[in-house]
Amino acid sequence: PDEISAVTDAVHATRKGVYVVVDNCYGEFTAEYEPRADMLVGSLIKNPGGGMALTGGYIAGSERAVELASYRLTSAGTGTEVGATLGQNRDMFKGFFLAPHIVMQAKKTAHFAAYVFEKLGFDVYPKAKEMRSDIIQTVKFGYAEGLIKFCQGIQSASAVDSYVTPMPWAMPGYQD
């Protein structure tokens, strides 16, 4: 959050009237405070939804920035007065309640994975002892077959669909 807040301050010092918007996807609840920006946006199906929210997103920030965005994200003229609930308020609120604990568990698991894979000789980012600003952990296998075998091994030990064997395919939107 400190680096993002510093960028926000630099932008505001350079250009008055500019809105700084941060897509905080996977970054929510990973630090003591959220980054400073005019507006933070994110998905409820990731960190803040705690695995419970089936859909949705959020906008938060300065009153003016949120007001301007609200007229683009809802029906014309309704702004922040309404929002899509789709009959899912219960799951969304349960997700918000559970999210800090679930994100903490994800961070611990990422630290552990980084430590284990570092000890096994793999290149990881972030390193096990580095500060994290999200719940993403990268492990570089160095070759496609290693990644494929890893995914298949995880799936074979999973509680759900362990009989399924994941196979690579040309997924739209990804070149590699």
Locations of the language-model features?
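Conserved C-terminal alpha-helix-loop-beta "cap" of PLP-dependent enzymes
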Residues: 118-176
